[in-house]
Amino acid sequence: MTDRRRINGPAGATIPPVYEDSGISEVKALKIRSRPSNIIRKIYLKTGVTPSASGSAYLELETSANSGVSGLKLSCTVHGPRSLPRSSPFSPHMVVSTHVKYAPFATKQRRGYLRDPTERDLGIHLEAALRGAIIADRWPKSGVDIIISIIEGDQDREASKTQGDEVWDMMNTLSGCITVASAALADAGIDCVDTVAGGVAALVQDSDGSPEIVVDPIPSEHRKILAACCVAYLPMRDEVTNLWFRGDLPASDMDLYTELVEKGIQASRSANRVLVDCLTETVG
């Protein structure tokens, strides 16, 4: 008789470790950014991929020309608006619930089935970004669930874990989550003040040693990332709904902060054009 119980693999399974040596350093030195500093990667965005959900969308970023660097792949489903349980307290606004989860195979190290602190942080930032766009007072005592599955993370699978690129990969992941969630909300017919899109800008230091601000950074294409910010932006209202900084910047140079945010807004505008074209094609 066949055993139908589900047998999971070991929780700590990983790919074989890759250690830093002269060969890896030479390969890493060849990974040079081919895009201009103000151009984001190409985005593929499609709505209506999950018929059973109220709204859904799929987003995929262009895969880097460098070997071993995967492109971000996200799937988002929206369930609602629907009535809250009778036991829940009255809410004059719609209750927004976000859930971000990596697939077990999405990153170099296998992810567990329970959400870790990284995924909870992404969910909190995503909820803050979407609350500024949704017109929540039109659905009193109702709720909507926004679920994002990260099918493939945006990282260099040939790099060692000690290089610390995972911190900066979260920025690009959050940016993609904001954009794909906005498309899924529009597909679900939930009223928003504007389409919100995410963008990332980073202060990087390459081999020549001079810092430079680039949009949509890939950590493997730069020697070092000093700081980065992820911006959720409403282009028609010229408003920022969420701003996330990471890294070290001199407190005395406020112009550098301003320039970094402006570059993040520029990346958000580029992503928003793809979002609007996708929704226009769907309606047409």
Swiss-Prot record:
One of its GO terms (molecular function) is RNA binding. This is Exosome complex component MTR3. Pfam families: RNase_PH. Keywords: Cytoplasm, Exosome, Nucleus, RNA-binding, rRNA processing. It is found in: Cytoplasm; Nucleus, Nucleolus. GO terms for biological process: nuclear mRNA surveillance; poly(A)-dependent snoRNA 3'-end processing; rRNA catabolic process; rRNA processing; U4 snRNA 3'-end processing. Component of the RNA exosome complex. Belongs to the RNase PH family. It comes from the Eukaryota. InterPro entries: ExoRNase_PH_dom1, ExoRNase_PH_dom2_sf, PNPase/RNase_PH_dom_sf, Ribosomal_Su5_D2-typ_SF, RNase_PH. The keyword Cytoplasm applies. The lineage of its organism: Eukaryota, Fungi, Dikarya, Ascomycota, Pezizomycotina. Gene3D superfamilies: GHMP Kinase, N-terminal domain. GO terms for cellular component: cytoplasmic exosome (RNase complex); nuclear exosome (RNase complex); nucleolus. Transmembrane segments: none annotated. The gene is MTR3. Non-catalytic component of the RNA exosome complex which has 3'->5' exoribonuclease activity and participates in a multitude of cellular RNA processing and degradation events.
